[in-house]
Amino acid sequence: MEIINYLIIALSVLFGASLTFFSGFGLGTILLPVFSLYFPIDIAIAATAIVHFSNNIFKFGMVYKHVHWPTLIRFGLPAMGAALLGALLLNFMGKQAVIYSYVLFHKELSITSLKLVIGALMLFFALFELLPKLSNWKMEQKYVPLGGVLSGFFGGISGHQGAFRSVFLTKTGLSKEEFIGTSNAIALVIDITRITVYATTIFKIIDFNGIKTSLLIGIAFAFLGTYFGKQLLTKTTIKGIQRVVGALLLVIGGLFCAGIL
């Protein structure tokens, strides 16, 4: 690989990790397409999981004191169980029928009914973060487990658990520090599960050309992005975090509807 390729990886990770510190998602969404430019998709997925997991451990060391344990238990545990069900349902559904396909930058992209539904849901939930009247709505504590189930299920079936987790967590009344700490703790547990699933592939990728340097750069710049995010924590508010979450949901939802993700 050339130096410019490593630079693209570094800048992508730096940007993604900085955003993820506040939003609770985004690093994997940005990094996977970048890695897939240079490596086979199975290698790219495993490499993304390694960087994501390493960064979540680093981030947890910074924010563990702010984890809101009651929410972690009442929201996180149902979310994890529902995420597994969603992932199993996705596997059961098999290959989706293509509604429309087109070519963009020499790559064939397909729009399926599932992608449209997931994208539409993300766009809908984005309104709850961006519109003033809806952004002030708070979830009653008795509905927190239900929020965990819904976020986990939609996350499991879409492969983007962080996005749905964040939009529900912002409605639980947590402070910005508690939101970041609790979201990270849930993500870390999910990452541990994911790493075990990818273990076989991870052992295979070590000798793949360019992967060691790419991983080292990815992990180092993820740490740097997370550090930058931590420095900006005092300058942001929970409203600011909601806007970041909403903006990312709009982008990712649009990409789903367009068949790019």
Map each language-model feature to its residues.
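Selected transmembrane alpha-helices and immediately adjacent juxtamembrane segments
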Residues: 1-39, 128-183
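Structural signature of hydrophobic alpha-helical transmembrane segments
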Residues: 5, 35-53, 109-120, 149-159, ...
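Residues within membrane-spanning alpha-helices of integral membrane proteins
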Residues: 6, 49, 119-122, 126, ...
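Residue-level signature of the transmembrane alpha-helical core
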Residues: 10, 14, 18, 49, ...
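Hydrophobic alpha-helical transmembrane segments in multi-pass integral membrane proteins
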Residues: 44, 84-94, 155-160, 194-197, ...
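Selective hydrophobic functional segments
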Residues: 46-105, 192-238
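Transmembrane helix exit motif
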Residues: 56-62, 87-98, 112-140, 231, ...
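Cytoplasmic-side transmembrane-helix entry/capping segments in multi-pass membrane proteins
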Residues: 69-79, 139-148, 181-184, 241-246
